[in-house]
Amino acid sequence: MNLSEIGYRRVVVKLGTSVLTSGSLKLDKAHMVELARQMACLMKAGVEVVLCTSGAIAAGKEHLGYPKLPDTIASKQLLAAVGQSQLILAWSQLFSIYGLHVGQLLLTRADLHDRERYLNARDSLNALLNNGIIPIINENDAVATAEIKVGDNDNLSARAALLCDADLLILLTDQKGLFDADPRKNPDAKLITEVQNIDDSLRMLAGGAVSGLGTGGMATKLEAADIARRAGVEVVIASGHYKDVIQNVVCKKPVGTHFTALEHPLESRKQWILAGPKARGQLVIDAGAIGAVTEKGRSLLSKGITEVKGLFQRGDTLELIDTKGKVYAKGMSRYSSADVTKLAGKHSDSIEEVLGYDYGDAVVHRNDMVVL
């Protein structure tokens, strides 16, 4: 690899189940060897690599001889517990061929929700990278419940990119990238090679495109790309079976769909608000508040709130939505749901009179808010 061609310093590579199994019921070890070789080449060239890998449940099924288990959460957790050890063993053996060590990080939403745990995870990730060790990240499916799951490794990889301050996220799948129509149904579908803005039309386009296996379709990849690019991370969605795909992407060759990063990325704390805490509730806001928040960069005042959804405490993260459910922003509330219910529609100067105390004029301050 020509060092002068490399355009990145730190790269997160996400491998979906469909890439690791090549559409079969077991891990495709031959293809994993090839992927490990490409990542090892990057490491040897001075590019730090973080691997976000799916495939634990598939590996568990294979190792146990495809047992007939009930379709329950406990069965999936069993398979994940067995399969994760096999998955990390396989990657460890493959990277050892190139004299490289790996370190395992299993995360849940809870690790990202709490600011202190988020920073601890970041420190662990950076410690591995600073010592030339390849971090291998997966969701901790053996213990994760619906409440604490990130949900898919596309979004987990985007959060990993934020954690380690990567400048490129590569999402490898069984598709060549994002198309302007479903290529399986429309032979005239064209690959979208460059995306500079993710809007509702693009989200609708990705909504029906699903990868062959795993929990992540094209819609989740678009969500991941949006999170990453807001933090200044470039994103590429490409086929995991394209020859030398990882090296070609890192050398900025025209492969897959490239998402440009925002010119002015979010600062660290707002990155955490965007990617870390799960929203505990929603505030329905009127047109005036939507304009003030999204166009003028102002805080959300109680006057603009028309409805409170969910139960939350002071400091919890909320979504700001319109009456149709469209999300305009995400931020941390200075008041509990009980408080906001009392304050909704009222002027800020009446807060102390209504509640008997005052945490400030804004329900969600602009410094604690990310506009989407």
UniProtKB/Swiss-Prot annotation:
Its EC number is 2.7.2.11. The keyword Kinase applies. ATP binds at K14, T173, D174, T215, G216, G217, M218, A219, T220, K221. GO terms for biological process: L-proline biosynthetic process. It holds the Pfam family PUA. One of its GO terms (molecular function) is glutamate 5-kinase activity. Pathway: Amino-acid biosynthesis; L-proline biosynthesis; L-glutamate 5-semialdehyde from L-glutamate: step 1/2. GO terms for cellular component: cytosol. The keyword Ion transport does not apply. Signal peptide: none annotated. Residues 280-358 form the PUA domain. It is an enzyme of class 2 (transferase). Substrate binds at S54, D141, N153. It catalyses: L-glutamate + ATP = L-glutamyl 5-phosphate + ADP. Keywords: Amino-acid biosynthesis, ATP-binding, Cytoplasm, Kinase, Nucleotide-binding, Proline biosynthesis, Transferase. Gene3D superfamilies: Acetylglutamate kinase-like (3.40.1160.10), PUA domain (2.30.130.10). It comes from the Bacteria. InterPro entries: AceGlu_kinase-like_sf, Asp/Glu/Uridylate_kinase, G5K_ProB, Glu/AcGlu_kinase, Glu_5kinase, Glu_5kinase/COase_Synthase, Glutamate_5-kinase_CS, PUA. It is found in: Cytoplasm. Catalyzes the transfer of a phosphate group to glutamate to form L-glutamate 5-phosphate. Belongs to the glutamate 5-kinase family. NCBIfam families: proB. This is Glutamate 5-kinase.
